[in-house]
Amino acid sequence: MTNIRKSHPLLKIINSSFIDLPAPSNISSWWNFGSLLGICLAVQILTGLFLAMHYTSDTMTAFSSVTHICRDVNYGWILRYLHANGASMFFICLYIHVGRGLYYGSYMYTETWNIGVILLFAVMATAFMGYVLPWGQMSFWGATVITNLLSAIPYIGTDLVEWIWGGFSVDKATLTRFFAFHFLLPFIISAMVMVHLLFLHETGSNNPTGIPSNMDMIPFHPYYTIKDILGLLLMIMVLLMLVLFSPDMLGDPDNYTPANPLNTPPHIKPEWYFLFAYAILRSIPNKLGGVMALVLSILILIIIPVLHTSKQRSMTFRPLSQCLFWLLVADLLXVTWIGGQPVEXPYVIXGQLASIXXXXIXIXXXXXXSXAXXXXXXW
């Protein structure tokens, strides 16, 4: 009699995905972030579910319901801060996961990559709507500023914005629908994650050398299960240090002031994980141009497989491309920092230059360097 995990219709799917899955023998810790993202999603859905039990999506009571969760609900404070800082961990893992894909040429699995980019957009949309829910000053003004960007779309822009708002400004209708979508999207994301994995398992994982690893595979369990658990423990440790020692470190103090449409905060800025996109948006003086740059700064990931001109898949043996990759990382860190600064003298020009550099490295330089390396090595 065969083992039930290999014969049962449901268990055999799990078995072929997480237990007997052949995996390359040399994938490094950079490959841990996929499983960490799965755990992050689970943590966010669970904490979010318990928060939703006590939250009210009404402009009059939203702010005080969050206060009530922190003060009166059993362990409500830890639920709230796990959810808020869990989002930060989610984005740290996301950006590392995408960076890993860029570095090691994982984008050559086009279907997996494209679903991944759509997932990135979905998670960003979810995080944005979640930030609006506590109905603090930064929630309200962030929602106003970001939704207002859609008015830059020619002809239908204004109607579109008012349709999203459900009125002539960000108000009760907006908050209610944002709560509905913030609750719904993570489940859609979960379904898309399954599709992401389905496409990945069609090809199998890439590895740091970028060379096919069909001749040297090991079972996922126990080797990578134990490795994933180690990564998970490290991530939980960092998350708990954030939550228990400095839960508000990544938040904005303005969000502890209830939303007031008559009083604009001095510096409207999003959470840290959107600052790079916000800086790129601000660096273009034209409204429509800024919105296009904002969307394209992330949508550019879609065309990365087309720009791949090297004969090698991974950057492991391409020093020139490595330099450009780390230059891009440094550039995005600098853009993130500028996004948090006020619109003043040195920051404006620096932000514009960094945004131009970010786009130029991603489009022109990466492709040119790969081609040059190929030419130099006379392939």
From Swiss-Prot:
Molecular function per GO: metal ion binding; ubiquinol-cytochrome-c reductase activity
Protein name: Cytochrome b
Residues annotated as binding heme b b562: 83, 182
Extra remark beyond the main annotation: Heme 1 (or BL or b562) is low-potential and absorbs at about 562 nm, and heme 2 (or BH or b566) is high-potential and absorbs at about 566 nm.
InterPro entries membership: Cyt_b/b6_C, Cyt_b/b6_C_sf, Cyt_b/b6_N, Cytb/b6-like_sf, Cytochrome_b, Cytochrome_b_C_euk/bac, Cytochrome_b_N_euk/bac, Di-haem_cyt_TM
Keywords for this protein: Electron transport, Heme, Iron, Membrane, Metal-binding, Mitochondrion, Mitochondrion inner membrane, Respiratory chain, Transmembrane, Transmembrane helix, Transport, Ubiquinone
Similarity field: Belongs to the cytochrome b family.
Database matches in Gene3D superfamilies: Cytochrome Bc1 Complex, Chain C (1.20.810.10)
Transmembrane segments: 33-53, 77-98, 113-133, 178-198, 226-246, 288-308, 320-340, 347-367
UniProt: heme b b566 binding residues: 97, 196
Alphabetized CDD domains for the sequence: cytochrome_b_C, Cytochrome_b_N
UniProt: a ubiquinone binding residues: 201
Subcellular location per the Swiss-Prot or TrEMBL entry: Mitochondrion inner membrane
Subunit structure: The cytochrome bc1 complex contains 11 subunits: 3 respiratory subunits (MT-CYB, CYC1 and UQCRFS1), 2 core proteins (UQCRC1 and UQCRC2) and 6 low-molecular weight proteins (UQCRH/QCR6, UQCRB/QCR7, UQCRQ/QCR8, UQCR10/QCR9, UQCR11/QCR10 and a cleavage product of UQCRFS1). This cytochrome bc1 complex then forms a dimer.
